[in-house]
Amino acid sequence: MPIETPSTSLASAPPSRRLALKTFASLASVAAIGGLALAGCSREDGSKSAAAGGPAVVKKTGDKVAFKYPNNPSFDLIYLADELGYFEGTNTRPEYVGKIAAPQIIPLVGTGEIDFGSRMVPLVISAIASGADLKVVAAGGKTLQEAPHMKYFVRKDSGIRNPKDLEGKTIGFNSFGACAEFVTKKYLRQHDVDVTKINFVVIPDEQAEQTLVTGNTDLAIIHAPFSGRADNAESLVRLWSDFDLDGGLGGMAPYSAHGQFIRQHPEAVRDVVAALAKAGNWVNANTEEARKLVAKRINMDLKNVDRYAYVDDLVVTEPPIQYYIDILQSEGKLAAGKVAVKDVYTNEFNPFAQQQAAKS
């Protein structure tokens, strides 16, 4: 699947963005090499690199603050905010650093090798518990019945129709330690499934459908936008969505920032959060147009691109965070009292949250 690089972004960028992208071109090309190398590293390798060199120094281009961000093929508000011009009129711009594997995003935010990243709440909680310097600064996607965060697929001829049928089978998801693992295991245990009898393997979302079709997995958990392609595959059937499993409580995918960047560039963080919130609200109001933009970005047939929904104004609320603190404690992954909800997030940089607070 073609992946948009900084150079292709420059070629296709609207005139209002082209000059800024040219300005960052040299930085982005160098950073892309580093980002791709880091994507293949283990969590331990990333930690060692950061320990040896310290947090990455924040780069500036002219009077613009450049924040380092992955250039992944996905439905992401940073790319949409950039495309929609929501960084125009600010002193802040994204500096895309190449594709970074999903499991590496939060570890690299925690070390400062990238400045922002979007991954699920349990990964952020675990990183904070281990001493990483990061914080959630904006909410992200939300699960609706008509717009789930993730969907569960099997082959039509698999004979798998209920949770108990999964014992002895192989489940593919995009990473351990996140929503796909913990929401699924919680649900399966509620239905008396012995999860130790299930083989869990990591498969990137963009490869999950094909891996299931070819029989290398028995159930695939796939996130939007790629889940739409599996919905349209003739040989597959959808069993559930995460809305069926927990009513959507575990579906918030927030945006986190490195602590050093927050402390050094609070105005840039406000710029980013405001742009994200505007983009999220735009997606909620323009779902079909958003799908078209993402289809173009990831080079996928529009009919196969699943829609997204976002938390209004991207204001972070506490229940989704407490939900995962409780799960991590029950899984033995987090000591009681090690991380409190308030340790995980802040709405300080969200102008919409400040407006809500002023009204109340």
List each model region and its residues.
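Pocket-lining segment of extracytoplasmic ligand-binding domains
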Residues: 122, 201, 206-293
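Short, glycine-/small- and polar/acidic-enriched structural segments
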Residues: 48-191, 202, 218, 238-240, ...
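Bacterial lipoprotein signal-peptidase II cleavage site
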Residues: 38-51
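Short helix-loop capping/hinge motifs at secondary-structure junctions, enriched
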Residues: 157-164, 194, 260-269
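Short, solvent-exposed loop/beta-turn-alpha elements that line the ligand-binding surface or hinge
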Residues: 89, 141-145, 244-248, 313-318, ...
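Secondary-structure end/capping motifs
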Residues: 263-336
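Conserved C-terminal helix/tail region of periplasmic/extracytoplasmic solute-binding proteins
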Residues: 329-360
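N-terminal secretory signal peptides
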Residues: 1-19, 26-36
